[in-house]
Amino acid sequence: MFISANQFEREMGVNKTIGKFFVDRKPPENNSFWKGRLLYISFGNGFVSIPVYYDILFRIGIPVEILLNEDHILFMEQLMHYAILHEKREISMQEELNTICSLLKGRIQNSKYYEALNLYLDQPVLKPMGPFGVPFPSLNRADVFLYVLCDLPLNEMQWQQAIRFWYALHPSYLIMDDLRDYAKDKEEGEENVMIELGEGTEGFEKTLELYRKNCETIHEINPLLAQFLTNSEEDLMVFVPLKA
């Protein structure tokens, strides 16, 4: 389904230049994340989250021309390619990390955060370490995307903000996916935050409480996006389990 730059701006507060750049961009060839896609951005959290997070980076002071620099975007797209290969179990986590790190050679803007991210992602189970991670490993499963920050000229405050708002934004998208996919994930033994939080109505309520707290944090940087996510909560209520 098509989503327009105007929708991004009107409903989620995304800067129009950023929204238009991604909406109008041609899906990269030979890239597993966009494989078979006619549109660069469609209605799926994995796609929508890209312009939304880049808008947050713009809001914390990263210029648009740096964020949308072609070399940087090509790196981000390659990162997504290897991330989805790992998600599909076509490559190991170590192969994914090694390849992404090789892509970053000569590009690293902050070695301290880069090395800290390497140590964090090298864990067999992603538990909080340094500035990275939340207490629920299933909500850390997309954190390889944070390597995009290593390719950008962030100062110390911007690093802290970029990480803080990442952990408010992307786990919220994962919570949406996990609530919708709960029964399927449980049957197939996949990661799911509701399974971590105890399942049943109690687990559902704990999951929603996390979601609401994330929306409060997002409100600090983008009130319109926070309202959009809050409004989406009603759609998630249909997934509340009737019994444990």
List the predicted regions and their residue ranges:
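Short, N-terminal intrinsically disordered low-complexity segments that are rich in Pro/Gly
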Residues: 7-8, 39-43
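Divalent-cation-assisted or electrostatically stabilized phosphate/pyrophosphate-binding catalytic cores
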Residues: 128-138, 186-219
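Alpha-helical structural motif
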Residues: 14, 49, 96, 207-211
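Short, highly charged low-complexity linear segments
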Residues: 109-121, 201-213, 228-241
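All-alpha helical catalytic cores of prenyl diphosphate-utilizing isoprenoid enzymes
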Residues: 26, 43-53, 63-186
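Internal amphipathic alpha-helical repeat/solenoid segments
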Residues: 31-39
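Short basic/hydrophobic patches in alpha-helices and adjacent helix-turn junctions
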Residues: 171-174, 178-181, 196, 213-221
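C-terminal domain/tail detector
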Residues: 2-29, 47, 54-87, 217-244
